[in-house]
Amino acid sequence: MAMNLENIVNQATAQYVKIKEHREPYTAHYNALKDKVYSEWKSSAVLGKLLKGSTLCGGYGDKLKVSIPDEFDLLIHLVFPENDKIIVKADASKPGNVILDMTKVMEIIGSQEHNKPVFDRLQKIVNNKKQLLEDKLNSFLESIMTQTLNKMGNQIEVAGRISHLQYKKCGPAHTIFVKGSCKYSVDFVPAIRLSAAQVVLAPEQRIHFGETLYWDAIPKPMKPAKTDNTSFTSSFYEAERRLLYGKQFLKPAIRLMKQNRNVKNKANLKSYHIKTLFLWQVIQQDPSYWSNSPKDIFIEMLGKLADSLALTPKKGKLPFFWDPKLDMFAQLTDSQRTDLYNHFRKCEYTFRKDNGNVNDCTENNVHSSFSKNTTYKL
Protein backbone atom coordinates (compact mmCIF):
# COMPACT_ATOMS: atom_id res chain seq x y z
CA MET A 1 0.00 0.00 0.00
CA ALA A 2 1.41 3.37 -1.03
CA MET A 3 2.03 5.55 2.00
CA ASN A 4 0.25 8.88 2.13
CA LEU A 5 -0.46 11.18 5.06
CA GLU A 6 -3.85 9.63 5.74
CA ASN A 7 -2.41 6.12 5.95
CA ILE A 8 0.34 7.30 8.29
CA VAL A 9 -2.14 9.13 10.55
CA ASN A 10 -4.37 6.03 10.65
CA GLN A 11 -1.35 3.93 11.59
CA ALA A 12 -0.43 6.34 14.40
CA THR A 13 -4.03 6.37 15.62
CA ALA A 14 -4.09 2.59 15.89
CA GLN A 15 -0.73 2.55 17.65
CA TYR A 16 -1.08 5.42 20.13
CA VAL A 17 -4.66 6.64 20.38
CA LYS A 18 -6.89 3.56 20.31
CA ILE A 19 -5.43 1.50 23.13
CA LYS A 20 -8.07 -1.02 24.25
CA GLU A 21 -6.06 -3.76 25.94
CA HIS A 22 -6.19 -2.12 29.40
CA ARG A 23 -9.79 -0.96 29.34
CA GLU A 24 -11.58 -4.02 30.69
CA PRO A 25 -9.65 -4.33 33.99
CA TYR A 26 -9.78 -0.57 34.54
CA THR A 27 -13.50 -0.29 33.91
CA ALA A 28 -14.26 -3.36 36.07
CA HIS A 29 -12.27 -1.85 38.94
CA TYR A 30 -13.87 1.56 38.46
CA ASN A 31 -17.38 0.06 38.46
CA ALA A 32 -16.70 -1.74 41.74
CA LEU A 33 -15.44 1.47 43.37
CA LYS A 34 -18.30 3.57 42.00
CA ASP A 35 -20.92 1.11 43.23
CA LYS A 36 -19.36 0.90 46.70
CA VAL A 37 -19.10 4.68 47.14
CA TYR A 38 -22.61 5.24 45.81
CA SER A 39 -23.97 2.58 48.18
CA GLU A 40 -22.35 4.31 51.15
CA TRP A 41 -23.75 7.66 50.06
CA LYS A 42 -27.25 6.22 49.76
CA SER A 43 -27.12 5.31 53.45
CA SER A 44 -26.73 8.99 54.38
CA ALA A 45 -29.91 10.46 55.90
CA VAL A 46 -29.75 13.58 53.73
CA LEU A 47 -27.60 12.73 50.72
CA GLY A 48 -29.42 9.43 50.30
CA LYS A 49 -32.64 11.36 49.66
CA LEU A 50 -31.00 13.59 47.04
CA LEU A 51 -29.13 10.99 44.97
CA LYS A 52 -30.79 10.26 41.64
CA GLY A 53 -28.26 8.25 39.67
CA SER A 54 -25.06 9.17 37.89
CA THR A 55 -23.71 9.74 34.40
CA LEU A 56 -20.26 8.79 33.18
CA CYS A 57 -19.04 11.89 31.36
CA GLY A 58 -15.72 13.42 30.35
CA GLY A 59 -13.48 11.70 27.84
CA TYR A 60 -14.62 8.19 28.70
CA GLY A 61 -18.33 9.01 28.73
CA ASP A 62 -18.03 10.89 25.44
CA LYS A 63 -15.96 8.03 23.95
CA LEU A 64 -13.15 10.52 23.45
CA LYS A 65 -10.64 9.05 25.91
CA VAL A 66 -7.20 8.43 24.48
CA SER A 67 -4.67 5.87 25.66
CA ILE A 68 -5.14 4.17 29.04
CA PRO A 69 -8.48 4.88 30.80
CA ASP A 70 -6.85 6.21 33.97
CA GLU A 71 -9.31 9.04 34.62
CA PHE A 72 -13.06 8.74 35.07
CA ASP A 73 -15.50 11.64 35.42
CA LEU A 74 -18.82 10.87 37.06
CA LEU A 75 -21.68 13.34 37.38
CA ILE A 76 -23.58 12.58 40.60
CA HIS A 77 -27.13 13.82 40.08
CA LEU A 78 -28.71 15.55 43.07
CA VAL A 79 -32.45 16.21 43.08
CA PHE A 80 -34.07 18.06 45.98
CA PRO A 81 -37.64 17.44 47.10
CA GLU A 82 -39.84 19.83 45.05
CA ASN A 83 -36.86 20.29 42.75
CA ASP A 84 -38.99 21.91 40.05
CA LYS A 85 -39.70 24.77 42.47
CA ILE A 86 -36.06 25.89 42.40
CA ILE A 87 -36.01 29.37 40.87
CA VAL A 88 -33.05 29.56 38.49
CA LYS A 89 -31.59 32.94 37.57
CA ALA A 90 -28.65 33.76 35.32
CA ASP A 91 -25.71 35.18 37.28
CA ALA A 92 -25.32 38.63 35.72
CA SER A 93 -21.80 38.96 37.13
CA LYS A 94 -20.50 35.65 35.73
CA PRO A 95 -21.60 34.53 32.24
CA GLY A 96 -22.40 30.83 32.04
CA ASN A 97 -23.31 30.62 35.72
CA VAL A 98 -26.63 30.52 37.56
CA ILE A 99 -28.03 31.29 41.00
CA LEU A 100 -30.42 28.81 42.64
CA ASP A 101 -33.19 30.30 44.77
CA MET A 102 -34.54 27.64 47.17
CA THR A 103 -37.29 29.81 48.70
CA LYS A 104 -40.29 27.91 47.31
CA VAL A 105 -38.67 24.54 47.92
CA MET A 106 -38.14 25.37 51.59
CA GLU A 107 -41.63 26.82 52.00
CA ILE A 108 -43.14 23.51 50.89
CA ILE A 109 -40.87 20.97 52.59
CA GLY A 110 -40.55 22.94 55.84
CA SER A 111 -43.78 21.37 57.11
CA GLN A 112 -43.11 17.85 55.75
CA GLU A 113 -41.88 15.46 58.42
CA HIS A 114 -40.41 13.01 55.90
CA ASN A 115 -38.28 15.79 54.40
CA LYS A 116 -37.15 17.26 57.72
CA PRO A 117 -33.51 16.04 57.36
CA VAL A 118 -33.24 17.74 53.96
CA PHE A 119 -34.91 20.93 55.20
CA ASP A 120 -32.60 21.10 58.22
CA ARG A 121 -29.56 20.71 55.98
CA LEU A 122 -30.84 23.31 53.52
CA GLN A 123 -31.11 25.85 56.32
CA LYS A 124 -27.35 25.44 56.81
CA ILE A 125 -26.38 25.77 53.15
CA VAL A 126 -28.44 28.78 51.99
CA ASN A 127 -28.00 32.48 52.69
CA ASN A 128 -30.63 34.86 54.09
CA LYS A 129 -32.14 35.15 50.60
CA LYS A 130 -32.54 31.35 50.51
CA GLN A 131 -29.96 31.11 47.70
CA LEU A 132 -27.99 27.88 47.67
CA LEU A 133 -24.32 28.31 48.60
CA GLU A 134 -21.71 26.42 46.61
CA ASP A 135 -19.07 26.37 49.36
CA LYS A 136 -21.48 25.20 52.06
CA LEU A 137 -22.85 22.43 49.83
CA ASN A 138 -19.33 21.29 48.96
CA SER A 139 -18.28 21.28 52.62
CA PHE A 140 -21.23 19.03 53.41
CA LEU A 141 -20.35 16.66 50.55
CA GLU A 142 -16.69 16.71 51.56
CA SER A 143 -17.62 15.52 55.05
CA ILE A 144 -19.72 12.70 53.55
CA MET A 145 -16.85 11.61 51.29
CA THR A 146 -14.39 11.64 54.19
CA GLN A 147 -16.76 9.51 56.28
CA THR A 148 -17.24 7.14 53.34
CA LEU A 149 -13.53 6.50 52.88
CA ASN A 150 -13.05 6.09 56.62
CA LYS A 151 -15.77 3.42 56.61
CA MET A 152 -13.99 1.70 53.74
CA GLY A 153 -10.67 1.86 55.57
CA ASN A 154 -9.30 3.92 52.69
CA GLN A 155 -9.11 0.79 50.57
CA ILE A 156 -11.18 -1.47 48.35
CA GLU A 157 -10.86 -5.12 47.42
CA VAL A 158 -11.57 -6.03 43.80
CA ALA A 159 -10.98 -9.52 42.39
CA GLY A 160 -9.08 -10.48 45.54
CA ARG A 161 -6.66 -7.56 45.34
CA ILE A 162 -6.49 -4.59 47.70
CA SER A 163 -6.17 -1.07 46.31
CA HIS A 164 -5.47 1.97 48.47
CA LEU A 165 -7.64 5.06 48.18
CA GLN A 166 -6.82 8.72 48.72
CA TYR A 167 -9.40 11.52 48.69
CA LYS A 168 -8.77 15.07 47.54
CA LYS A 169 -11.04 17.98 46.71
CA CYS A 170 -10.16 19.18 43.17
CA GLY A 171 -12.26 22.11 41.92
CA PRO A 172 -15.88 20.93 41.62
CA ALA A 173 -14.80 17.28 41.88
CA HIS A 174 -14.48 15.05 44.91
CA THR A 175 -11.62 12.93 43.61
CA ILE A 176 -10.54 9.47 44.71
CA PHE A 177 -7.05 8.40 43.65
CA VAL A 178 -6.67 4.64 43.38
CA LYS A 179 -3.30 2.91 43.81
CA GLY A 180 -3.04 -0.82 43.25
CA SER A 181 -3.22 -3.24 40.36
CA CYS A 182 -4.97 -0.42 38.49
CA LYS A 183 -3.79 3.15 39.05
CA TYR A 184 -6.41 5.75 38.19
CA SER A 185 -8.62 8.52 39.56
CA VAL A 186 -12.35 9.11 39.72
CA ASP A 187 -13.84 12.60 39.80
CA PHE A 188 -17.19 12.44 41.59
CA VAL A 189 -18.78 15.71 40.43
CA PRO A 190 -21.97 16.76 42.22
CA ALA A 191 -24.58 18.09 39.81
CA ILE A 192 -27.97 19.53 40.73
CA ARG A 193 -30.23 18.15 38.02
CA LEU A 194 -32.62 20.72 36.57
CA SER A 195 -35.36 20.41 33.98
CA ALA A 196 -35.68 21.96 30.53
CA ALA A 197 -38.35 24.28 31.98
CA GLN A 198 -35.69 25.78 34.28
CA VAL A 199 -33.23 26.65 31.50
CA VAL A 200 -32.18 30.31 31.38
CA LEU A 201 -30.43 30.24 28.00
CA ALA A 202 -30.68 32.98 25.39
CA PRO A 203 -33.02 32.10 22.48
CA GLU A 204 -30.24 31.06 20.07
CA GLN A 205 -28.60 28.74 22.60
CA ARG A 206 -32.02 27.41 23.62
CA ILE A 207 -32.46 26.16 20.04
CA HIS A 208 -29.31 24.03 20.39
CA PHE A 209 -30.55 22.66 23.72
CA GLY A 210 -33.33 21.16 21.61
CA GLU A 211 -35.48 18.42 23.13
CA THR A 212 -33.01 17.61 25.89
CA LEU A 213 -34.87 16.95 29.13
CA TYR A 214 -32.25 17.90 31.73
CA TRP A 215 -29.22 20.03 32.49
CA ASP A 216 -27.13 20.53 35.62
CA ALA A 217 -25.85 23.21 37.97
CA ILE A 218 -22.36 22.33 39.20
CA PRO A 219 -21.04 23.66 42.54
CA LYS A 220 -17.69 24.75 41.13
CA PRO A 221 -15.62 26.91 43.51
CA MET A 222 -14.60 30.35 42.34
CA LYS A 223 -10.94 31.24 41.77
CA PRO A 224 -9.92 32.46 44.26
CA ALA A 225 -12.35 30.65 46.55
CA LYS A 226 -15.26 32.79 47.71
CA THR A 227 -17.15 32.43 50.98
CA ASP A 228 -20.95 32.22 50.70
CA ASN A 229 -20.70 31.78 46.95
CA THR A 230 -24.12 31.69 45.25
CA SER A 231 -22.81 31.11 41.71
CA PHE A 232 -23.09 27.64 40.12
CA THR A 233 -21.64 26.57 36.77
CA SER A 234 -24.15 25.54 34.10
CA SER A 235 -23.49 22.16 32.51
CA PHE A 236 -25.28 20.84 29.43
CA TYR A 237 -23.65 17.46 29.06
CA GLU A 238 -26.73 15.66 27.68
CA ALA A 239 -27.37 18.37 25.09
CA GLU A 240 -23.70 18.34 24.07
CA ARG A 241 -23.72 14.58 23.69
CA ARG A 242 -26.73 14.87 21.39
CA LEU A 243 -25.04 17.57 19.30
CA LEU A 244 -21.88 15.48 18.85
CA TYR A 245 -23.74 12.25 18.11
CA GLY A 246 -23.71 10.82 14.59
CA LYS A 247 -21.00 13.12 13.21
CA GLN A 248 -18.98 10.49 11.39
CA PHE A 249 -15.34 11.47 11.89
CA LEU A 250 -15.77 14.25 14.45
CA LYS A 251 -14.75 12.13 17.44
CA PRO A 252 -11.67 10.60 15.78
CA ALA A 253 -10.49 14.14 14.98
CA ILE A 254 -11.02 15.22 18.60
CA ARG A 255 -9.02 12.21 19.79
CA LEU A 256 -6.13 13.21 17.54
CA MET A 257 -6.12 16.73 18.97
CA LYS A 258 -6.29 15.45 22.56
CA GLN A 259 -3.47 12.97 21.97
CA ASN A 260 -1.28 15.68 20.46
CA ARG A 261 -2.06 17.96 23.40
CA ASN A 262 -1.16 15.20 25.87
CA VAL A 263 2.15 14.12 24.37
CA LYS A 264 3.28 17.73 23.91
CA ASN A 265 2.35 18.60 27.52
CA LYS A 266 0.02 21.45 26.59
CA ALA A 267 -2.05 21.08 29.77
CA ASN A 268 -3.36 24.66 29.60
CA LEU A 269 -5.58 23.51 26.75
CA LYS A 270 -8.37 21.69 28.56
CA SER A 271 -10.42 18.88 27.06
CA TYR A 272 -13.51 21.06 27.35
CA HIS A 273 -11.77 23.75 25.28
CA ILE A 274 -11.35 21.21 22.49
CA LYS A 275 -14.93 20.01 22.85
CA THR A 276 -16.20 23.59 22.70
CA LEU A 277 -14.19 24.30 19.54
CA PHE A 278 -15.91 21.35 17.87
CA LEU A 279 -19.38 22.23 19.22
CA TRP A 280 -19.18 25.56 17.40
CA GLN A 281 -18.19 23.76 14.22
CA VAL A 282 -21.15 21.37 14.54
CA ILE A 283 -23.58 24.26 14.11
CA GLN A 284 -21.45 26.11 11.52
CA GLN A 285 -20.54 23.25 9.19
CA ASP A 286 -22.82 21.30 6.86
CA PRO A 287 -23.44 17.79 8.28
CA SER A 288 -21.58 16.30 5.31
CA TYR A 289 -18.38 18.01 6.52
CA TRP A 290 -17.90 15.29 9.13
CA SER A 291 -17.57 12.63 6.43
CA ASN A 292 -14.16 14.09 5.57
CA SER A 293 -11.22 12.05 6.85
CA PRO A 294 -10.16 12.52 10.50
CA LYS A 295 -6.83 13.77 9.17
CA ASP A 296 -8.44 16.56 7.13
CA ILE A 297 -10.76 17.61 9.96
CA PHE A 298 -7.85 17.55 12.42
CA ILE A 299 -5.71 19.81 10.23
CA GLU A 300 -8.51 22.34 9.74
CA MET A 301 -9.36 22.35 13.45
CA LEU A 302 -5.69 22.98 14.30
CA GLY A 303 -5.98 26.18 12.29
CA LYS A 304 -9.22 27.24 13.95
CA LEU A 305 -7.76 26.52 17.37
CA ALA A 306 -4.68 28.60 16.61
CA ASP A 307 -6.89 31.45 15.35
CA SER A 308 -8.82 31.44 18.64
CA LEU A 309 -5.56 31.59 20.62
CA ALA A 310 -3.91 34.37 18.59
CA LEU A 311 -3.01 37.65 20.28
CA THR A 312 -2.22 39.61 17.10
CA PRO A 313 -3.21 41.17 14.77
CA LYS A 314 -6.61 40.54 16.35
CA LYS A 315 -7.04 38.80 19.67
CA GLY A 316 -8.87 35.51 19.25
CA LYS A 317 -11.31 33.99 21.69
CA LEU A 318 -13.20 30.78 22.38
CA PRO A 319 -16.76 31.67 23.45
CA PHE A 320 -18.56 29.29 25.81
CA PHE A 321 -21.01 27.49 23.57
CA TRP A 322 -23.99 28.07 25.89
CA ASP A 323 -23.22 31.70 26.75
CA PRO A 324 -20.90 33.40 24.21
CA LYS A 325 -20.33 36.35 26.55
CA LEU A 326 -17.85 34.08 28.35
CA ASP A 327 -14.44 33.75 26.66
CA MET A 328 -13.02 30.43 27.79
CA PHE A 329 -9.46 31.57 27.06
CA ALA A 330 -9.79 34.75 29.13
CA GLN A 331 -8.05 33.22 32.16
CA LEU A 332 -4.95 32.28 30.17
CA THR A 333 -1.99 34.62 30.44
CA ASP A 334 -0.47 36.07 27.27
CA SER A 335 2.54 33.78 27.64
CA GLN A 336 0.30 30.72 27.99
CA ARG A 337 -1.68 31.72 24.92
CA THR A 338 1.48 32.38 22.94
CA ASP A 339 2.90 28.98 23.86
CA LEU A 340 -0.29 27.20 22.79
CA TYR A 341 -0.64 29.31 19.66
CA ASN A 342 2.94 28.66 18.53
CA HIS A 343 2.58 24.92 19.06
CA PHE A 344 -0.73 24.41 17.28
CA ARG A 345 0.08 26.80 14.43
CA LYS A 346 3.36 24.99 13.84
CA CYS A 347 1.57 21.65 14.05
CA GLU A 348 -0.97 22.85 11.48
CA TYR A 349 1.84 24.02 9.17
CA THR A 350 3.68 20.70 9.43
CA PHE A 351 0.59 18.62 8.66
CA ARG A 352 -0.48 20.85 5.77
CA LYS A 353 3.02 20.64 4.28
CA ASP A 354 3.13 16.86 4.62
CA ASN A 355 -0.41 16.55 3.30
CA GLY A 356 0.71 17.94 -0.03
CA ASN A 357 4.17 16.40 -0.13
CA VAL A 358 4.84 13.13 1.70
CA ASN A 359 8.60 12.74 2.14
CA ASP A 360 11.12 10.82 4.21
CA CYS A 361 10.36 12.92 7.31
CA THR A 362 6.57 12.62 7.15
CA GLU A 363 6.24 9.38 9.08
CA ASN A 364 8.49 10.63 11.85
CA ASN A 365 6.62 13.95 11.95
CA VAL A 366 3.27 12.20 12.39
CA HIS A 367 4.41 9.66 14.96
CA SER A 368 6.18 12.29 17.03
CA SER A 369 2.94 14.30 17.07
CA PHE A 370 1.10 11.49 18.82
CA SER A 371 3.79 9.66 20.80
CA LYS A 372 6.59 10.60 23.19
CA ASN A 373 8.64 7.62 22.09
CA THR A 374 10.07 9.13 18.90
CA THR A 375 13.13 11.25 18.36
CA TYR A 376 11.74 13.80 15.91
CA LYS A 377 10.84 17.13 17.51
CA LEU A 378 7.94 19.03 15.94
Swiss-Prot record:
GTP binds at residues 187, 233-240. Mg(2+) binds at residues 71, 73, 187. InterPro entries: Mab-21-like_nuc_Trfase, Mab-21_HhH/H2TH-like, MAB21L/cGLR. GO terms for biological process: cellular response to virus; cGAS/STING signaling pathway; defense response to virus; immune response involved in response to exogenous dsRNA; innate immune response; response to exogenous dsRNA. ATP binds at residues 71-73, 237-240, 258, 271-275. Belongs to the mab-21 family. This is Cyclic GMP-AMP synthase-like receptor 1. It comes from Drosophila melanogaster (Fruit fly). The lineage of its organism: Eukaryota, Metazoa, Ecdysozoa, Arthropoda, Hexapoda. The gene is cGlr1.
